[in-house]
From Swiss-Prot:
GO terms for biological process: chromosome organization; viral DNA genome packaging. This is Terminase, large subunit. Residues 1-58 are annotated as: Interaction with the terminase small subunit. Its cofactor is Mg(2+). Residues 312-482 are annotated as: Nuclease activity. A motif (Walker B motif) lies at residues 199-204. It comes from Salmonella phage P22. The gene is 2. Interacts with the terminase small subunit; the active complex is composed of dimer of terminase large subunits and a nonamer ring of terminase small subunits. Interacts with the portal protein; this interaction allows the packaging of viral DNA.
Length: 499
C-alpha cells in the first residue's frame, strides 16, 4: 500500500505520529551508516586480509568503493563495534562475523589524504559526513552516538583536526576513548613524525617518505597500515614496493569496475568508454600504467569467455605451482586439438595449505587428470621428508612422472610466456570469466627496469605455463569419464590334428 493511501486512512494525530516515527528511523539510519555497510567480495577480501597482513594496499579503479571500505574498517577499529560482537546490531548488513584485524583496546588512528581540501571532501566526509551542511560530525561511518567531541582545524574551512570516539569491548561495554586525527600529505613529512599510534589509513597514494613515517608510528603495536587508491601515478615508489618487492607482511588486493555491484553492465561499459584511453586501465581496473614493462598488453575482454561443459573430444591436463608462504596454484587446461584452441577452465589458489587440503579443494575436478608440476617438486621437506611431488601423489593427485619441460627438454620461462601471448593474440587461448585469480595476475605481470620478469604474484600464470608445456600428456575427456575397458581375448582352443 502506498504511503499516501495509508495516510488517508489515519487520523491527523496518527499521521503526525507515523511521520515522526519515519523521520526518527531515517535520522537513525543517517547517523549509523556503519551498520549499512555490506561489503562486496573484493572489499571483504581486503578487510579479511588484515588478519594476516600488517600492510595492505587496496588498488582499485575510480568510484568503486575503495574509500568507503577504508572508512568502514577504520570506524570499526575506532568504536570496537566489530560485526559479530554485542556492540554491533543484529540487523546490521555486514553479513557474517569480522575476520580481519581486531584491536582489543581504544586506538589512535591517523587518516591521510593529499591536501586539506581532499581530506575534507573525501576521508572526512565519509567518516564524519559533511560538516558544512550539518555543523557537526556524526553523519558518516562513525556512529553519531559514539562521537564524544571534535575539534576544527585552523588550516582549512570545515576541516576536522581530530575526533574523540567511544570504544567498546566485544560485550558492547564502553571501555575508553579512541582518537582519530586527519593529516594531509601536503604539510610535509615533519607533520608525520613523533607520535605513537595503532594504525594509519592512507587514502590516495602518499609520497613514499610519508608512507614510511606513518607506518613507523605504528611499530609499537605491531604495525598497521591500509592504503586505498587508484594508481594514476603508474609504477611509483609505493606501487613498486608492493608489486615488485613485497615483504611477507604486505598484501595487494585489486578491484576492477567489474567487481563493483552497484553498476549495471551497460553503465560499466559507458564509464570505461568515457575515460581517456591511456587512463582506462588505472581508472577502471586499478592497474598501474607500466608502459612497455607490462608483459600481457592485451585487453582481457579479448581472451575472456563464458564457462561451458567440457566436450568429450577435448584433451585435459591439470598443472600446479607449489607454495606455502606464497600461494600454491592449481589449474585445469582444456585443448581442442581440432581447432588448436586452449581454454583455462578452472583455477584454485591458496597459501599455507597442505597437499591433503589442496586435494580436498580440487578433487571434484582434478580426479584422474594428469598433473604437470615444476622442478621444485623434487625438493624434500626440511628435515629430509618426502619429495613435494610424492606428497601430492599420495594425497590423490595424478602427478606426471617428470617435471614440466617442453618436448625438447627445455623449460624457458620466456619461451612459455611468448607462446602463450602469441596464442592470446591469435584468439587461440581463452580463459573462463570465472577464473579471476588468473586475471589478477595477468593484469600486473611485468618486467623490471632491466627487462627481467618480476617473479611475484605469478602462481596461476606459472601453473598455466606448466600445463601448456606438458600438453602432450593431456588425456581425452571421453577416456577420463568412461575409461576404456580392457578386452581379454578369448582363450585359444587347441587345434586337433588328423592322424
Amino acid at each position: 500500500m502506498e504511503l499516501d493511501a495509508i495516510l488517508d486512512n489515519l487520523s491527523d494525530e496518527e499521521q503526525i505520529e507515523l511521520l515522526e516515527l519515519l523521520e526518527e528511523e531515517e535520522n537513525y539510519r543517517n547517523t549509523h551508516l556503519l551498520y549499512e555497510f555490506a561489503p562486496y567480495s573484493k572489499q571483504r577480501e581486503f578487510i579479511d586480509a588484515g588478519h594476516d597482513y600488517p600492510e595492505r594496499c587496496f588498488m582499485a579503479g575510480n568510484q568503486l568503493g575503495k574509500s568507503f571500505t577504508g572508512a568502514a574498517e577504520v570506524a570499526f577499529h575506532l568504536t570496537g563495534r566489530y560485526p559479530g560482537t554485542k556492540g554491533y546490531p543484529a540487523d546490521g548488513k555486514y553479513g557474517g562475523e569480522w575476520k580481519g584485524k581486531r584491536f582489543y583496546e581504544p586506538v589512535v588512528f591517523w587518516i591521510g589524504g593529499e591536501t586539506n581540501e581532499t581530506v575534507t571532501k573525501t576521508t572526512q566526509r565519509i567518516l564524519c559526513g559533511r560538516i558544512e551542511e550539518n555543523d557537526e560530525p556524526g553523519y558518516g561511518s562513525i556512529p553519531k552516538e559514539d562521537i564524544i567531541s571534535w575539534k576544527k582545524s585552523p588550516f582549512f574551512p570545515n576541516l576536522v583536526d581530530h575526533l574523540l570516539v567511544k570504544h567498546h569491548t566485544a560485550d558492547g561495554v564502553e571501555d575508553g576513548i579512541s582518537i582519530c586525527y586527519f593529516k594531509p600529505y601536503s604539510q610535509g613529512r615533519a607533520r608525520w613524525q613523533g607520535d605513537t599510534i595503532h594504525g594509519v589509513w592512507f587514502d590516495e597514494e602518499p609520497p613514499y617518505s610519508i608512507y614510511g613515517e606513518g607506518l613507523t608510528r605504528t611499530n609499537k603495536y605491531g604495525q598497521f597500515s591500509i592504503l586505498t587508491f587508484t594508481p594514476l601515478m603508474g609504477m611509483s615508489d609505493v606501487v613498486t614496493k608492493f608489486l615488485k618487492n613485497p615483504s611477507k607482511s604486505q598484501k595487494v588486493v585489486n578491484m576492477t569496475i567489474y567487481d563493483a555491484e552497484h553498476y549495471t553492465d551497460e553503465q560499466k561499459e559507458q564509464i570505461i568508454a568515457s575515460y581517456p584511453e591511456h587512463e582506462r586501465e588505472a581508472r577502471a581496473r586499478g592497474i598501474p600504467t607500466m608502459g612497455s614493462g607490462r608483459i600481457f598488453q592485451i585487453p582481457e575482454e579479448t581472451i575472456k569467455c563464458q564457462p561451458f561443459e567440457c566436450p568429450d573430444h577435448f584433451y585435459v591436463i591439470d598443472a600446479q605451482d607449489f607454495g606455502w608462504n606464497h600461494p600454491q596454484a592449481h589449474i585445469q587446461l582444456w585443448w581442442d586439438k581440432d581447432a588448436d584452441v586452449f581454454y583455462l577452465a578452472r583455477v584454485w589458489k591458496k597459501s599455507e595449505n597442505t597437499a591433503v587440503q589442496a586435494w580436498g579443494a580440487v578433487k571434484s575436478w582434478a580426479n584422474k587428470i594428469p598433473v604437470a608440476w615444476p622442478h621444485d617438486g623434487h625438493q624434500h621437506e626440511k628435515g629430509g621428508g618426502e619429495q613435494l611431488k610424492t606428497q601430492y601423489a599420495d594425497a590423490g593427485f595424478s602427478m606426471l612422472p617428470d617435471h614440466a619441460t617442453f618436448p625438447d627438454g627445455g623449460n624457458s620461462v620466456e619461451s612459455g610466456i611468448s607462446e602463450l601471448r602469441d596464442l592470446m593474440l591469435e584468439g587461440r587461448f581463452k580463459v573462463f570469466n570465472t577464473c579471476e585469480p588468473f586475471f589478477e595476475e595477468f593484469r600486473l605481470y611485468h618486467r623490471d627496469e632491466n627487462g627481467k620478469i618480476v617473479k611475484t604474484n605469478d602462481d596461476v600464470l606459472d601453473a598455466t605455463r606448466y600445463g601448456y608445456m606438458m600438453r602432450r600428456f593431456a588425456r581425452m575427456m571421453r577416456d577420463i569419464r568412461k575409461p576404456k575397458e580392457k578386452k581379454i581375448p578369448a582363450p585359444i582352443r587347441p587345434v586337433r590334428r588328423g592322424r
